[in-house]
């Protein structure tokens, strides 16, 4: 994956001009207010782009007067859609559309992490119940089944045996959407009732936090 070069300053009519930053939001939370304040303190012009009220005219030659769009949208579908449009318009986005699309697909994300040498869970993708059962035999049980796309711990399941895995996957097949025909499978990690969330910038962990819960799904505690 190639890194995206983001602008830091611009020249207009031969004179240096401040960066014009568009901040895409669903709600102005405390974090977004801090970002806007920090940008203003650095002489960056900011425009709040409210996802629910904005309209993107795809056929107009006019473009929003921004040099960079920072995605702080809560709704992934809306945020990803807006970023793709700005990307087509030649306006850089943060995160890049490539990064957003990678994070939206667990299969692609797992492949990217493995390719980058990042330690991760044993993970496999299968496309039939019989091949998924082979994964269960190799990884052992319990086996975790996740949707390819999704967040907040939704639609996660723990199969404790081959029989329960078969039943679970048969139910997924009946849901009808193409996402449920791809079986994303991970080994189960026996851990304390917690999740560790780390924030990495430039290859360095700058902060981390525990999320504690009694349920085995702890990432949304």
Predicted regions and their residues:
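ATP-binding N-terminal substructure of ATP-dependent carboxylate-amine bond-forming enzymes
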Residues: 1-99, 103-104, 108
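Active-site nucleotide/adenylate-binding loops and adjacent lid/helix of ATP-dependent enzymes
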Residues: 2, 15-21, 25, 61-62, ...
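Flexible, glycine-rich phosphate/dinucleotide-binding loops
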Residues: 30, 55, 102, 132, ...
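Short, surface-exposed linear patches
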Residues: 42-47, 69-71, 90-94, 115-117, ...
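Residues at the C-termini of beta-strands that transition into short coil/loop
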Residues: 50-52, 73, 97, 127, ...
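Alpha-helix termini
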Residues: 56, 80, 103, 130, ...
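Phosphate-binding core of ATP-grasp and ATP-grasp-like enzymes
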Residues: 173-175, 179-182, 187-221
């Amino acid at each position: 994956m190639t890194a995206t070069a983001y602008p830091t300053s611009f020249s207009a009519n031969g004179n240096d001009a401040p960066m014009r930053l568009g901040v895409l939001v669903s709600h102005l939370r405390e974090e977004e207010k801090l970002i806007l304040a920090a940008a203003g303190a650095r002489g960056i012009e900011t425009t709040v782009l409210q996802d629910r009220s904005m309209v993107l005219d795809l056929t107009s030659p006019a473009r929003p007067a921004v040099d960079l769009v920072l995605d702080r949208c809560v709704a992934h579908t809306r945020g990803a859609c807006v970023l793709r449009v700005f990307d087509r318009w030649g306006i850089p986005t943060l995160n890049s559309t490539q990064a957003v699309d990678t994070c939206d697909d667990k299969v692609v994300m797992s492949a990217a992490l493995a390719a980058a040498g990042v330690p991760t869970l044993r993970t496999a993708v299968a496309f039939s119940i019989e091949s998924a059962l082979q994964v269960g035999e190799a990884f052992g049980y319990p086996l975790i089944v996740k949707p390819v796309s999704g967040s907040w711990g939704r639609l996660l399941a723990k199969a404790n045996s081959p029989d329960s895995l078969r039943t679970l996957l048969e139910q997924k097949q009946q849901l009808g959407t193409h996402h449920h025909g791809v079986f994303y499978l991970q080994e189960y990690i026996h851990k304390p009732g917690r999740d560790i969330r780390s924030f990495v910038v430039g290859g360095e962990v700058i902060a981390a936090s525990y999320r504690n819960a009694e349920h085995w799904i702890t990432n949304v505690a």
